[in-house]
């Protein structure tokens, strides 16, 4: 079976390492685990890998966060991947830092990337793996927080957290969403 694994983030060097780009960080960790490299393609950088009998198409949209839906739709159509086999990797302010939560569907929770994907797909019925950023910011400073860098203490924990995310992604593809949620949520 084929799966589309989409890491959300903003393109451009100024966004590398920011909290909002943790989706890119997770999909990069998956590519590294699979020993594959991304190549530039239409609407983003793409990598192909296998995990046992599952074929994974990894995508880092180059459309900016708020237009991610165009890239997702294009690659779903290009690779003939149904919505049930799409997993979007995304940051989440509502979860404490480092919390990983797999969801089968849901609202955009104020995330513009998820909002655009839902608009373009015409549905909120697609899986997402949310990476908790926490809410350690002053009122009105949300944008600065998500576009800011992780603290040194957080950065120290990221390798282990992204490794855990890779396990969840692989389980999603091999065992299905329900079993994976039961095991990891």
From Swiss-Prot:
Protein's UniProt name: Peptidyl-tRNA hydrolase
Keywords: Cytoplasm, Hydrolase, RNA-binding, tRNA-binding
Pfam families: Pept_tRNA_hydro (PF01195)
Alphabetized HAMAP family for the sequence: Pept_tRNA_hydro_bact (MF_00083)
Assembly: Monomer.
Catalytic residues (UniProt): 20 (proton acceptor)
Organism: Porphyromonas gingivalis (strain ATCC 33277 / DSM 20709 / CIP 103683 / JCM 12257 / NCTC 11834 / 2561)
Site residues, Stabilizes the basic form of H active site to accept a proton: 91
């Amino acid at each position: 079976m084929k799966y589309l694994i989409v890491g959300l983030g903003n393109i451009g060097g100024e966004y590398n390492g920011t909290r909002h780009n943790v989706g890119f960080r997770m999909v990069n960790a998956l590519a590294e685990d699979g020993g594959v490299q991304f190549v530039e393609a239409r609407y983003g950088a793409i990598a192909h890998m296998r995990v046992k009998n599952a074929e994974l198409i990894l995508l880092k949209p180059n459309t900016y966060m708020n237009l991610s839906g165009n890239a997702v739709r294009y690659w779903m159509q290009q690779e003939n991947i149904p919505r049930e086999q799409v997993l979007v990797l995304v940051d989440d302010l509502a979860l404490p830092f480092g919390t990983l939560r797999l969801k089968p569907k849901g609202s955009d929770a104020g995330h513009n990337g998820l909002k655009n994907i839902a608009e373009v797909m015409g549905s909120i019925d697609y899986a997402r793996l949310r990476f908790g950023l926490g809410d350690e910011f002053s009122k009105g400073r949300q944008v600065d927080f998500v576009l800011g860098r992780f603290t040194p203490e957080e950065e120290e924990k990221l390798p282990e957290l992204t490794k855990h995310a890779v396990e969840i992604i692989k389980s999603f593809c091999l065992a299905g969403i329900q079993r994976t949620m039961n095991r990891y949520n």
